[in-house]
Amino acid sequence: MAKIIGIDLGTTNSCVAVMEGDKPKVIENSEGHRTTPSIVAFTDDNEILVGQSAKRQSVTNPEKTLFAIKRLIGRRFDDPIVQKDIKMVPYKIMKADNGDAWVRVKDQDKAPPQISAEVLRKMKKTAEDYLGEEVKEAVITVPAYFNDSQRQATKDAGRIAGLEVKRIINEPTAAALAYGMDKKRGDSVIAVYDLGGGTFDISIIEIAEVDGEHQFEVLATNGDTFLGGEDFDLALIEYLASEFKKDTGIDLHNDPLALQRLKEAAEKAKIELSSAQQTDVNLPYITADASGPKHLNIKLTRAKLESLVEKLVERTIEPCKTALKDAGLTVSQINEVILVGGQTRMPLVQKTVEEFFGKEPRKDVNPDEAVAVGAAIQAAVLSGEVKDILLLDVTPLSLGIETMGGVMTKLIEKNTTIPTKATQVFSTADDNQTAVTVHVLQGEREQASANKSLGRFDLRDIPPAPRGVPQIEVTFDIDANGILNVSAKDKATGKAQSIVIKASSGLSEEEVAAMVKDAQSHAEEDKKFKEMAELRNQADSLIHSCEKSMKDLADELSEDEKKGIETAISELKEAVQGTDKTRIEDKLKVLTDASAKMAERIYAKKSSEGQAAQGQTQSQESTKPVEEGVVDAEFEEVKEEDKK
């Protein structure tokens, strides 16, 4: 029997896996890598390059090298998110005849699923080379927060690549399958925090033993389909470009070639700073002007990078709160936290997740491979190789139709287990109305126009009657892929009309490149290098906290205090650019002393606020000291056990 493969089609990287016996196997590509860059390039010789070969030539061919296509999938050209993307990428995004966002390469317009299909074809070939037989079927993963259009476009991409897509499953759910398949049976609730190359998802999943089956039930899901590693790269690119402009007066945004080199360097620096405290961004001959060639050389510390992406990491917390609320759970009821997606390797992300959930995330799940492994497990369930696993996924967004007054009437609420079916009876708004338009919507807003329009169709030849008399039965049917079929029927005549929601946008991939560690040969040089890196890190950290505090206390500082701190910050920034350790230490001390009074004020302010809050809750604390004590102890206990 032919194998069904599991594919993680990511924004940045893709991965393919297959079940061998009772073990999932991640398959290496022809270059020997377990993940493949989700990049497609078109050369002047009419050759199509996919993966590493496309990535290697991106600097010399930026306008015909397509990356992060997944961020365009199922989106209209006029979507503000697409407009933002246009400014971020060197290739051309244009408006298709149907209003969707497509790409233009070598005077040809291509839909995103066509580009994504090239990556899927590479994954298919990788699996076929390993298995020694043709592969025709696949399970493909998508972000949990993908809407109906985006899911349909993913299926289209599979079809273009010559694959029958047996099932579309959500990435966090796939990761939960990968984590839970070989764990001991028993009930537990896990949070899957998935921050990939272009999208963010959080899913709360209950793993339980039900009638001898290992049941994975998604309780709630939330996310942001335009937040990921690409945004972290962009924040760093903007910083590097602005620093270069300060030094030279040249804006690198006007040079696609330089911008592509900057993107590669930013991605590399970001990865290095997950394991190192400091790195050098060194790009010789980045550009030139009348005076000659220009070189970019900027020292970057982990603290500086963290200050640049702090707000992006904070954006992931609100969806976590919403998912917990929708699941009807508190943080203390989560047993384990799983991290998925290459961007979760960043220490700041791990720290933020640990602080929010009150427990250390598990380290035994490979963030780059877990999703593909889960897809392979689901593929084995569909083919009958694995028999005792039941997966209950949900629809991430509410579905409904537009009714009188421009209101969205929901037929299926968000976080409803799929497959599911819902029927509701509506009537006409005017006397003698002979046709109704069914406008299908997806989203959470009351106002119809504020939600995503999935499509519309007309039910005609309704017998004339006073308003409110005809009975039109509207049925929403969501299949196991999360794809919607809508039908409407006039109960009097039996006349019916239906629509399968179709999208004509497309996508690409997700996942992150491997880390590079620089080994130094001489121990003494290592020691000096580390000391300087830590010192710069300390300086950047202090600068960031001082600048933040000055904003918070702007009204409470005297002009002299402000001037003193600003001067100290400026001098320390200048010292950090050099290599004189003593000078950095001196300027660090000056800023520390200058900000001491400000720190005392913050402490005093927080202390007085804390005392006020304590006074308000004192009576509550006295009534339930035991319960609160137990919760605290439980947090500590879980942490300790995790560490063992």
Curated annotation (Swiss-Prot):
Residues 629-644 have a biased composition (Acidic residues). This is Chaperone protein DnaK. Keywords: ATP-binding, Chaperone, Nucleotide-binding, Phosphoprotein, Stress response. Belongs to the heat shock protein 70 family. Acts as a chaperone. InterPro entries: ATPase_NBD, Chaperone_DnaK, Heat_shock_70_CS, HSP70_C_sf, HSP70_peptide-bd_sf, Hsp_70_fam. The gene is dnaK. It comes from Legionella pneumophila (strain Paris). Residues 605-644 are annotated as: Disordered.
